[in-house]
């Protein structure tokens, strides 16, 4: 996405080059800031996670990351992974992390990131975008709903889908220190 004015912020959204140190540094810094948010882990990333994050994203075969900039300053990130829908026999993109720095919130940066992901998904023939959001994160839910997201349902009478997780590491090795039973 070319640079555009979005509610007083000059936003440029680019697909990150995971071989570019400037991009990977911005990704790690933004994910670390996201981790410290009260609606995330509420604590910085562990040093070993910070050290492994860029190479882990680079080495994962389905990683797709978008960065939002205001001038030279990184202000948002969308970390995504390609998946596959067996019911549609088509690829999909899961937005695993979406974060905007606090002083750029409410200015359309999240929507610009979501639009960039959506454009890429359409280009790649994806059947849908998926994401998870805390029920209590009303602000994020509003943004997602305004962008066309809704709780996943397959049969209305069956109710909505739930996201579930099973930790595989012992408690002292879990990356998510605050939410018992989940890993981010």
Residue ranges and their predicted role:
Residues 43-65:
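Active-site rim helix/loop that mediates acceptor-substrate recognition in acyltransferases
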Residues 73, 83-95, 105, 125-127, ...:
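A conserved beta-turn-beta hairpin within the catalytic core of GNAT-like acetyltransferases
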């Amino acid at each position: 996405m070319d640079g555009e004015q979005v509610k007083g912020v000059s936003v440029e959204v680019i697909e990150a080059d995971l071989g570019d140190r400037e991009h990977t540094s911005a990704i790690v810094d933004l994910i670390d800031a996201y981790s410290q948010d009260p609606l995330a882990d509420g604590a910085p990333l562990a040093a070993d996670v910070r050290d492994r994050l860029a190479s882990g994203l680079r080495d994962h075969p389905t990683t797709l990351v978008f960065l939002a900039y205001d001038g030279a300053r990184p202000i948002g990130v969308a970390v995504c992974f390609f998946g596959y829908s067996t019911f549609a026999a088509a690829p999909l993109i899961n937005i695993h992390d979406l974060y905007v720095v606090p002083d750029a919130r409410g200015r359309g940066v999240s929507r610009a990131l979501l639009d960039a992901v959506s454009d890429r998904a359409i280009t790649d023939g994806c059947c849908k975008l998926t994401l998870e959001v805390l029920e209590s994160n009303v602000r994020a839910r509003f943004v997602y709903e305004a962008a066309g997201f809704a709780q996943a349902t397959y049969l209305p009478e069956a109710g909505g889908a739930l996201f579930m997780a099973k930790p595989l590491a012992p408690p002292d090795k879990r990356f998510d220190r605050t939410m018992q039973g989940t890993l981010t």
